[in-house]
């Protein structure tokens, strides 16, 4: 009986230590979410401005730019999958990968090859475990992405988009990431990045109609300069949204783990007390039995 009590004490001690760790990680994630949301908000003015600029150029010109022209036949699609580097975030990465699997199945059903580009060690481990190939992978800092990483990703995707199919190029680019809606709601999302669909944002109201411009130098040169910046901004925005979603998911997961640890501590405490009472009862019974034996 005494050994059983010691086991419960050890379980209570270890679970209490784990609860402290969960609480610390929850507080860290909570503090970082505010910074992540602020970065998302800070990126919006630039993203909106460059989106308006690209829309103005593309809608007011009749040129066939490679990044805005729909190919006659789409044979290979690139899929950029943004996950996390670390775990302890609930089903965050699993949800993104499930969404990516659904997109991959859809593209295969349309007769398209799929070329994967991965962000985050979770996506890399997922593909490695299944012996599936991928073109590129970027790891490190998924919960605090840097614009330089988005530039590198954008450059790699644009390079393959500009390459012929026979040389391993792609005809369209999709991005799978988690959109941050609120602290309790994050939604796995798919967007098609290229070829650029000019009318892909919500329709502007009459007061927001784009004015007419005359472009210097030529419109094609303006697009050549703007579109890479536009692609980088869209990728960076997706990475920032994913980072905020990852931290929110981790905060919820750690809170849930802490609550479960509290329940376990209560359970083990109750079992320990029951075992202690049983031990005391047994000792009293032995004392009474011994006294009766002496009296007789």
Swiss-Prot record:
State the family it belongs to: Belongs to the ATPase gamma chain family.
Q: Which GO terms describe its biological process?
A: proton motive force-driven plasma membrane ATP synthesis
Look up keyword Ribosomal protein and say if it applies.
no
- From the UniProt record, report the name of the gene that encodes this protein: atpG
Name used for this protein in its record: ATP synthase gamma chain
Q: Where in the cell is it found?
A: Cell membrane
User: Which GO molecular-function terms appear in the entry?
Assistant: ATP binding; proton-transporting ATP synthase activity, rotational mechanism
Q: Which UniProt keywords apply?
A: ATP synthesis, Cell membrane, CF(1), Hydrogen ion transport, Ion transport, Membrane, Transport
A single GO cellular-component term on record? plasma membrane
Membrane disposition = Peripheral membrane protein
Where mainly found? membrane
- Biological role: Produces ATP from ADP in the presence of a proton gradient across the membrane. The gamma chain is believed to be important in regulating ATPase activity and the flow of protons through the CF(0) complex.
Quaternary structure note:
F-type ATPases have 2 components, CF(1) - the catalytic core - and CF(0) - the membrane proton channel. CF(1) has five subunits: alpha(3), beta(3), gamma(1), delta(1), epsilon(1). CF(0) has three main subunits: a, b and c.
Q: Tell me the NCBIfam families matching this sequence.
A: ATPsyn_F1gamma, PRK05621.1-2
InterPro entries in UniProt: ATP_synth_F1_ATPase_gsu (IPR035968), ATP_synth_F1_gsu (IPR000131), ATP_synth_F1_gsu_CS (IPR023632)
């Amino acid at each position: 009986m005494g050994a059983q009590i010691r086991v419960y004490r050890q379980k209570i001690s270890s679970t209490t230590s784990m609860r402290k760790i969960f609480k610390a990680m929850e507080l860290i994630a909570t503090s970082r979410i505010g910074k992540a949301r602020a970065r998302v908000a800070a990126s919006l003015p630039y993203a909106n401005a460059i989106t308006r600029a690209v829309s103005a150029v593309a809608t007011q010109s009749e040129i066939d730019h490679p990044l805005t022209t729909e190919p006659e036949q789409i044979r290979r699609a690139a899929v950029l999958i943004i996950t996390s580097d670390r775990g302890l975030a609930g089903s965050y990465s699993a949800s993104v990968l499930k969404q990516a699997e659904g997109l991959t199945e859809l593209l295969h059903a349309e007769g398209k090859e799929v070329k994967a580009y991965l962000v985050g060690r979770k996506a890399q481990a997922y593909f490695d475990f299944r012996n599936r190939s991928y073109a590129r992978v970027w790891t490190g800092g998924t919960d605090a992405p840097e614009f330089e990483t988005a530039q590198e990703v954008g450059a790699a995707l644009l390079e393959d988009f500009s390459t012929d199919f026979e040389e391993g190029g792609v005809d369209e680019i999709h991005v799978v990431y988690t959109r941050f809606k609120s602290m309790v709601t994050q939604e796995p999302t798919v967007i098609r990045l290229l070829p650029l669909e000019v009318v892909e944002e919500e329709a502007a109201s009459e007061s927001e109609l784009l004015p007419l411009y005359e472009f210097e130098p030529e419109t094609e040169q303006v697009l050549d300069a703007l579109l890479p910046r536009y692609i980088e901004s869209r990728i960076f925005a997706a990475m920032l949204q994913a980072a905020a979603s990852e931290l929110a998911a981790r905060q919820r997961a750690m809170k849930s783990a802490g609550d479960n640890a509290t329940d376990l501590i209560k359970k083990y405490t109750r079992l320990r007390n029951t075992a202690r009472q049983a031990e005391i009862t047994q000792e009293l019974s032995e004392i009474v039995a011994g006294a009766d034996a002496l009296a007789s």
